[in-house]
Amino acid sequence: MKLFLDTANLGQIKKLNQMGVVDGITTNPTLIAKEPGEFEEIVRAICSEVKGDVSAEVVATDSDGMVSEGKRLSTIAPNVVVKVPMIPEGLRATKSLSAAGIRVNVTLVFSANQGLLAAKAGASFVSPFIGRLDDIGQRGMELVEDLVKVRDNYRLKAEVLVGSIRHPQHVLEAAKVGADIATMPPEVMEKMMHHPLTDAGLKRFLDDWEKAKKTRASGAV
């Protein structure tokens, strides 16, 4: 499974990208607005840092506007994926953009029916938001399971890109059910690296090594 970061912060991206664990980036207008600089400059800088897919979202709400924005965004870098919302106008834009050879990530997917429609319209990625479903008492991972089954049953080309991830367990569950990609905030990826037994084990190794050095040094005197 590919692991993406859901952020537009270049510092965080560079830090984690150096570890060789970042396959791509997803952004949205909220994340972009938190960073200094112009929208396209931020996306261009991210695309230079990360060689994998970088999703950049349109802000238009009509299909013509989405197509126009999407075509402009696609010229920023070859690894840009145009992100559009799962609304009727978004489906129209997805059909037009994909027909023009531009890859599309359909976002804000909250049902398998929406995901199926997005895939049929030509989306390269379908993004279910599991954390937000959990927030309203539904089990978000059931949606991922349904989308994976539909993808496999009909050999759809759209990849299941799981978003709205809140904790490492979400990532593990997405991997176990066969999602193609999980995108997460940097802090979730950092939490995935740690375990208290790892920290305790390392401390013990280092403490034992220091004791051994002191013993050897005192014995040599």
Regions found by a protein language model. Name each.
Residues 1-14, 19-22, 26-96, 130:
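Active-site beta->alpha loop and helix N-cap motifs at the rims of alpha/beta catalytic domains
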Residues 11-18, 65-73, 93, 111-121, ...:
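Catalytic cores of alpha/beta
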Residues 20-24, 51, 76-79, 96-105, ...:
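Glycine-enriched alpha-helix->loop->beta-strand junction motifs that scaffold or abut catalytic
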Residues 28, 82, 118, 174, ...:
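Conserved, mostly hydrophobic/aromatic
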Residues 40-54, 74, 91-104, 140-160, ...:
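Alpha-helix-loop-beta-strand connector modules within alpha/beta enzyme cores
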Residues 151-221:
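C-terminal alpha-helical cap/extension of soluble enzyme domains
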